[in-house]
Every structure is written in structure tokens, then in C-alpha cells.
Amino acid sequence: MMPPVRGTLTEGRPLADLTWLRVGGPADWLFQPADEEDLAGFLAAHDPAVPVFPMGVGSNLIVRDGGLRAVVIRLGRGFNGIRVEGERVIAGAAALDAHVARRAAEAGRDLTFLRTIPGTIGGAVRMNAGCYGSYVADHLIEVRAITREGRAVTLPAADLGLAYRQSRLPEGWVLVEAAFRADAGDPAALARRMDEQIARRDSSQPTRDRSAGSTFRNPAGFSSTGRADDTHELKAWKLIDEAGMRGARRGGAQMSEMHSNFLINTGGATAADLEGLGEEVIKRVFQSSGIELQWEIMRVGEEPVNKQ
């Protein structure tokens, strides 16, 4: 029995069309809360034995073909506001990273590193996303979240344990807002920088294909702040190339010919195709270099019960 809500609660909702890779089975339930009060009330009344899984726009996610035995919580309107208050940029967890970068730039504040990061602010904080030498950890002041028990809490960035592509946000907590500190900048200059970033991305990454962004973490040096050495020679794509896996295929899944650290759905791929190809890449890279790549794409859910 699910608690009453003012938002939308759907049983057996397929998730494939909510992910960038367009694969995956159904969630037991999909909850799209109307606002913070609706979200908090639902979590407070929800059976603690039933898992919850916060989901953004599915940009960094493989949902397995058997679906997800959980309540998937997907924030939308009511959670995507953006405002600038002096040096602070406050964004709802459902705000797109690109929109936050643009809104900040219009106000003369520099969060340009977010412009080419796919997904939402909630996911960017949870994964300590970064680009062009800047990371969420470098700018984050604090976050607001709803706990699994339905309590609203505010946490300083230092309490999140932000590191390279990870955080220690407790399982089941739902981020609702994040505040960033952003340096001042000329709006026109910031806009030009973002245009250059987009051009650079589009010339080197398969942005026209169905992908989930970078597939594996770079095995480069990094510190507890999340800063990575972007000039480090040890890049995941180089290791993949050296293992002969650029362009490798399994079913409808392929390691992109354009950028070999991008796993793409060429059409008709299953989650098993995509994850299986990724695991084969890990195996081949380890055989070639002795280095074990780590997934950057999150994989969740179960295999189909009738899997042979």
C-alpha cells in the first residue's frame, strides 16, 4: 500500500524512455512529487523496507532489463528553480547542469564547467561531476535534502565526503537543492567560453549517439577534494585503445569509434548488451595493462527472471 500523494505515482512504470541509453525494465513504482512537502510526506509514510532510488534524467545510468525493485523518485517541476544571490548560485536538484551554467553566466557568475556536463544538479552533486579541471567540490557550499524518514536537512559540502566521481550521501536521501559559490565574470566572456566548450565537446565526443557520457573513470591522480589531474597521461580511452576495444560491439552496443570511452546504443541494444560489453572492456584492459577500470556509469536493477 503506497501513501497518498499530490504528485504522480505510477505502478510498473517502464524506465527505458527515461534514460539516455533507452534501455531497462520497469520500476515497481515511479513517484514524481509535486513539491518538497509532498516528497517529505511520502518518505515519512513509506515502508522503510521498500528501497527508494532517486533518479535524474537518466544521463549516467543503465537500468538492467529486469527492472528495479524499488520506488524510483524523479524530481521535476517544483525542483528545478535557479536563482543568483551575490556570489551564491542556488539550484534545484532537477535543474539541468547546462541551464545552471547559463543562468549563472547571465548574472555574471562563473559555473561554466557545468555547461557540458549532462544531467541534473542532483546527479552532479552525488557524483561530484567535473569538467575542464573544475569539480562540484570546488564550488559547493551546502545542500538541502530529504532523508529516508522524511526530514528536511541542510548539509555543508564538507559533510558529503566528495571525492573523484563520488560522495557519501546516505542511501535513500533525496537531494532537493544545492548552493554553489561562483566567481564573478563578464557575461559575454563566459558565454564565449561555454560556446568554445560545446564546440570542443562536439568535435571529440559522440554527442549525436545514444550514450551515457563517459563509461569508465580515468585512473588518474586525484585528491580528497575531487580535483583530478586532467593532464595525467593515464586516460581510460587510451587504455581501451591499447586493449584493441575501440569500436568493439556486442549486440546493439558499441564502444564509440569517435571516443572509445563512450558506450553507445546503436539501436536495439539491451541493458545486458551494454553492461556485458563494458565488462568485456574491463577484462581486456586488465589483460593488456594490469589496470582495472572502474565504471563511471551507474548500473542498477535486476536481470530478467527468465534469463537463460
Swiss-Prot record:
It is found in: Cytoplasm. It holds the Pfam family MurB_C. Residues 197-228 are annotated as: Disordered. SUPFAM superfamilies: FAD-binding/transporter-associated domain-like (SSF56176), Uridine diphospho-N-Acetylenolpyruvylglucosamine reductase, MurB, C-terminal domain (SSF56194). HAMAP family: MurB. Belongs to the MurB family. Cell wall formation. This is UDP-N-acetylenolpyruvoylglucosamine reductase. It comes from Cereibacter sphaeroides (strain ATCC 17025 / ATH 2.4.3). The lineage of its organism: Bacteria, Pseudomonadati, Pseudomonadota, Alphaproteobacteria, Rhodobacterales.
